[in-house]
Amino acid sequence: MAAPEHRTEKYARVSALEELLKDLNSNLAGANENYLKDSDERFTKIFLMGPHRSGSTLFLQWLANTGLAAYPTNLLSRFFGAPLVGAKIQQLLTDPRYNFRNEILDFNSEINFSSDNGKTKGALAPNEFWYFWRRFLPFDELDYLPGPELREKGDLAGLRDELNALANIFEKPFAMKAMILNQNIPELAEQFDKSLFIWIRRDPIFNIQSALEARKRQYGDINTWYSFKIKEYPQLKDLDPLESVAGQIVAINRSVEQGISQLPDHKKLVVQYEDFCRRPKYYYDEITRRVRDQDGLGGAAAPAYAGESSFSNTNIWRLEEYSSKDAAGAYERFQII
């Protein structure tokens, strides 16, 4: 088993909450099975891929705000073991269609564009939903398995059916982060006829800086590995922090590029974070076109775009331990390996 994490107090897990959720989800498992009867594939699943700290949280918050797709919320994440039950409860508590005389109006339905190491605030704000993914993936020391082994030991059919059923409950495409399978994209893609893989890339210099800053926030130093343990983890984990993170970003981008290379154009989209910040509507149009090409809207029309016209990106060098030139050099060294 992997070694225990030593998080800073702010990011430490709450053991009482973990136990409560484990008990709740275990007892709801049977009810969840009943909702799996409607798991035909009618809507597109939108998977966000790429390195951590590349802008994926902002992108998912933005996409959620457009109304095009449903997504895992902080409320839904509490039901990681019984998400179909959770989806029904979320509808009951938050969907205006089921509002009775304004009895329950306490849930925050607004989604802002702030986050902290991928974490958001608000019942209906997007959640990373990693506990859900791990139910189906037999990862241990590494967050990766060779394709044949993952197909044999994982429950990819179960993952497929629950995601299809979730989309059917919400009657929309379902969008979510899927970086836990950055290095197993073909195995995920083969589960769906209607899927869109979005590779979010960021200027690698600032991606490296942001990843190092995330280490410091999460663990109190820049030496401790942060995010999924990719297949290159054993070779990268004990390097100088800058080299470790640079190698991590290069390896992830390389894996995603290879993973989507065999997908048809209507099943993939490359998003450059800096360009997305300049013109988000362009990417909304690209997404909706691909979803329509898959007949992934269930016969409905895509909402007209009413979102942000632009975002400010955070590409300013702040790190004291290294310079931007150091980061560029480290990235280039791994690029040629």
Where are these regions (language model features)?
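PAPS-dependent sulfotransferases, especially Golgi type II membrane carbohydrate sulfotransferases
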Residues: 1-40, 216-337
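A conserved segment at the C-terminal end of the G1
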Residues: 57-68
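Conserved phosphate-donor/acceptor-positioning beta-strand/loop module used by diverse small-molecule
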Residues: 177-179, 188-213
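PAPS-dependent sulfation machinery
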Residues: 78-175
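Pre-Walker A (Motif I) flank of P-loop NTPase domains
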Residues: 43-45
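Short catalytic-loop micro-motif centered on adjacent basic/acidic residues
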Residues: 173-177, 270-272
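Walker A (P-loop) phosphate-binding loop of P-loop NTPases
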Residues: 53
